[in-house]
Structures are given as structure tokens and as C-alpha cells.
Amino acid sequence: MWFIFPQIAGLGQSSMSIRFAVASLDEAEAYLAHPVLGARLRECAQLTLEVEGKTARDIFGGIDEMKFRSSMTLFTRAASDEDLFQRCIDRYFAGASDPATLAKLQGQNSIS
């Protein structure tokens, strides 16, 4: 989960979560710009939107559902010029971004 849908640093406590965490909004923008990482994230996010009749909990399980929401919140902020990640939040979380991720991002501005 961590290397497909990474979260902002400071949320997860496991070694894998810490290893794959994104340090800042600037790093999230760089992640999106990377030819492999950005493309993979977009492809996987799009695939979740193609699942019919399932909730995020059905797809990922309870813990990873929270990680997915957190990741989509981070990349919604980082990709202000595209709506893919917001569509995931809209579809699976009734438009409600992850408050813990938003708190970590508070005060960070996009460089793009």
C-alpha cells in the first residue's frame, strides 16, 4: 500500500510507512512529476474509480482504506490542476478529505 499510495510523513508509525512517506507538498509534486511513480499512482487511482459496487473498505480493508484516503488527500493538494484524486475522495469518502493529512499540510504551499 505504502509504495503505491504514499502518505504525508508523520501519520504512519510502521517502518514501511516511514520509509515510503512523502516529506512535503513539494515532494508530492515531484512524485507526481516522476515518469514511473506519478504514472503508477494515477493508473492505480483510476483503477479504483473503475470498481463498481464496492466501498474503499471493501477494496482495501479498514486500515488501508484510511491510508488511501490520506494519500488521495495529499495528491489532491499536490495536483491542483487535475481532479483524479479528488474524484477518488468524492466517490469513496463523500468528498471529505482526510483531516489528519490536511493538518500536516497546513502552512505548506504548492510550488507550481
Question: What residues fall within each predicted segment?
Answer:
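Charged phosphate-binding loop/patch that engages nucleotide di/tri-phosphates or the phosphate backbone
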Residues: 78-112
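Hydrophobic/aromatic-rich, well-ordered segments within soluble, folded domains that form packed cores
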Residues: 1-25
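Mid-chain, well-packed structural core segment of small domains
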Residues: 30-79
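Serine-centered coil/turn micro-motif
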Residues: 14, 34, 82-83
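Short acidic/histidine-centered micro-motifs embedded in hydrophobic/aromatic stretches
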Residues: 7, 44, 91
